[in-house]
Amino acid sequence: MGRWASESRAPGTMRGGAWTAERSEGPHLRTEMMETLLFTDERCLLHETPYSHPESPKRLRKILDSLAAEPVPGTEQATVRPATRDELLLVHEVRHVDAILELRGRSTQLDVDTWLSPGSVDAALLAAGATVEAVRALKEGRARNAFVLVRPPGHHAESNRSMGFCIFNNVALAAAVARKQLGVERILIAGWDFHQGNGTQESFWDRSDVLCFSTHRKPPFYPQTGTLE
């Protein structure tokens, strides 16, 4: 694959609903590794939430439209796949995974602020699978960087429950795959959010090879976790 020219803004093209910046063919810019792979899928928009809910499809739609109108040089969209049940079981309990999968195609409320629409389970599987594939791409040397642009989010989802807009824990799953299947010996997960990633913390609380670093508002504040103690 070719590297993008970084000194000028490249026009974009649409390919099957995906955007890509046009590639420079200058020999001095050729390389075997893509600069940044973008993992996203418009099917993540199928996760619909109630009117005025802060985790809205409009958030992702706005970003995708902006990227289509003004592509970022040095990026290319990668193929996204759903996470498998076996992958989900690396961080989630069987009863939680199976309970969510049984709700595919249905609308329901999982907790006070976490909802499912008919497309939510498929969107959640794609979000988790995209994060796993991003880690694989980096480990295999297919890109220097990866950016995962998906929804629903994941860092509040614990091993046995969905919460805080999150259904499956995308980042925890990717870290588990990296550690158990890709031979990564040490992992740093940096969380930058107003709310602490309680689900990610729970996934690796007893492990010395995964460090979860988080900047967040301290309790008393949702999800009431993340104190210095």
Residue ranges and their predicted role:
Residues G119-V132:
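Glycine-rich anion/phosphate-binding loops
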Residues R81-G105:
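Charged, often glycine-rich, active-site loop that binds/positions anionic groups
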Residues R23-M33:
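Short, Lys/Arg-enriched N-terminal segments with co-localized hydrophobic residues
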Residues Q109-D122:
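Short glycine/proline- and acidic residue-enriched helix-loop micro-motifs
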Residues M34-E87:
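N-terminal low-complexity, Ser/Thr- and acidic-residue-enriched intrinsically disordered segments
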Residues S6-S8, S24:
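Serine residues within intrinsically disordered or low-complexity segments
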Residues V132, R136, F147-E229:
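Conserved alpha-helical scaffold segments that buttress catalytic/binding sites
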